Amino acid sequence: MTTPEDSARTAALWKPSAARAARSRITDYRQYVCRTRSLDLPDTTALWQWSITNLDPFWDSVWNYFDVAGSRGAGPALAKAEMPGAVWFPGATINFASQALRHAPSDAPAIIACNEAGDQLELSWTELAARVASLAATLRARGIVRGDRVAAVLPNSVEAVVAFLACASVGAIWSLCSPDMGAASVLDRFRQITPKALIAVRSYRYGGKIHDRSTVTAQLVESLESLALYITVPGPDDPGNTTSRSAHLATLAWQDAIAHDAALHIDPVPFEHPLWIVYSSGTTGLPKPIVNGHGGVTLELLKVMALHNDLHAGERFHWFTTTGWIMWNCQISALLLGATICLYDGNPGWPDAGALWRFADRVGLNFFGAGAAFHTGCMKAGVVPAGERLRSTLRTVGSTGSPLSPDAYRWLQSELGPEVWIAPISGGTDLSSAFI
C-alpha cells in the first residue's frame, strides 16, 4: 500500500512549464535523434534508456547534433568497448579550443569578469580569440610543443581562461592550482607532471585584502627544474613589471606575452590527446594526477551544458568556484556552446553574504551555480537573492559540493519563484563532469 509519506517522497519537486519544455535543448535533441535515426522516443525517459543501451549511436549523435569543430573520421564512435582500454572515435581529430573559439569573430561578450573590489572586464569573442592567438604564438616561439605540460597558479580571471585556451591550441597539457595554496601543496602536484612552462600570479585579492604570493612563486620557479619558461601575471596593485629572474629559464611579463598581433592557429589533435591534468584530494598520500582528453571532455561537456543544464548560446553562465575546484573546468566549458561565462574572483561572502547575488543581478545571469553550503549560508543570513534584473533573466540555479538540504531547496524556490529550476548535481573530479 502506498502511504502519504511515500507519495510525498516520489512526487516531482518541480516541473517545467509546457513552453519551457518545448524550447528546451533536450527536447530539441530528442526530436533530432528521432528524425535522424528513425526512432520513436516519446519522452526523455525513453531517450535516456536509448542512450545508455546504444552507446555507439548515442555518442555519434552527440557529435553530429553539435556539429563539433573537428574531423569525425571514419568508423564507429565506440570502436572497442572493453574496459579498461575502450577506444572512442578512432581517427578523429579535435581541439577543445577550436570548439570554444568557433564563435569568434563576434562583438558579443565571451567573458564578463568581476571581482570583489567591483572591477568588471568584458571581453568579446573577437578579443578573446586575439589574446589566445597571441599567447599561443608566444608559447610556440618559446619552444612549447604538443605534449608539453603548462602549469599555472592563477585566480578565477580572464588570464586563466586565455592561458588555458592558448595551451590547448598548441596541444600542450594544462594543469592549474589556486593561488591560495601553499608552495608545498602546489609542488606536490606539479613535480609529478614535470611542467615545461609556469604561468603564475604574484598577488591576489580575497576577503578585502591583497595577498602577496611572490615568495611562493619564487619557490616554484626554483624548485621545478623542468621549467624552461615562466610567465608572470600581475595581481592587484601590481605594476606588472617582470622582476624575478632565474638562470635556467626565460621569464616574460604577461603583457609582453600577449602583445603579438598573431593569427589564431589551433592544432588539431587525436581524440584521446590529453587536455588537462587535475588532481585527487591527496587524503591518501600525494594528490593523484588525473588526465582527461580533448575529445571526451568536449563531447561530455557539450552534452552536460546543453542537454542537462539547458544552456543556450548567448546566455550568461556562472558557477562560483576557485581555480582549485573542478567546477572551474566545468564553468569554462560553457564557451563550447557560445554562452558567456561570468567569472567572479574573490570571497562570495565579502563584504556580506549578498555579494555574489548582487553580482548575479548586475550581469543578468541566466544560470547561477554555487556550492550547497553557499546556498545554506545565504538562507541562514536572510539574504534576498534576486534583484530586479535577475528576476527577469534567471532560469536555473545549480548546486553541488554536498547535498542541498530540503530547507535550502524550499528557500531558493520560494525566493526565486516557481519558474526557476533548482538543479542540484553530483559528479566528480575524475570525470570532470556530473553523473546526477
Language-model-detected regions and their locations in the chain:
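AMP-dependent adenylate-forming
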Residues: 35-40, 97-124, 237-239
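Conserved AMP-binding/adenylate-forming core of the ANL superfamily
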Residues: 46-50, 97, 111-165, 182-187, ...
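Conserved pre-ATP/AMP-binding loop-to-beta segment of ANL
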Residues: 107-109, 231-232, 245-279, 286, ...
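Conserved adenylation A10 loop of the ANL superfamily
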Residues: 117-118, 277-289, 305
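Structural core segment of the AMP-binding/adenylate-forming
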Residues: 165, 169-255, 363, 371-372
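Conserved helix-loop-beta element of the AMP-binding
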Residues: 194-198, 215-230, 317, 342, ...
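Conserved AMP-binding/adenylation subdomain of ANL enzymes
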Residues: 298-316, 326-366, 381-382
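Gly/Ser/Thr-rich phosphate-binding loop
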Residues: 339, 366-369, 379-436
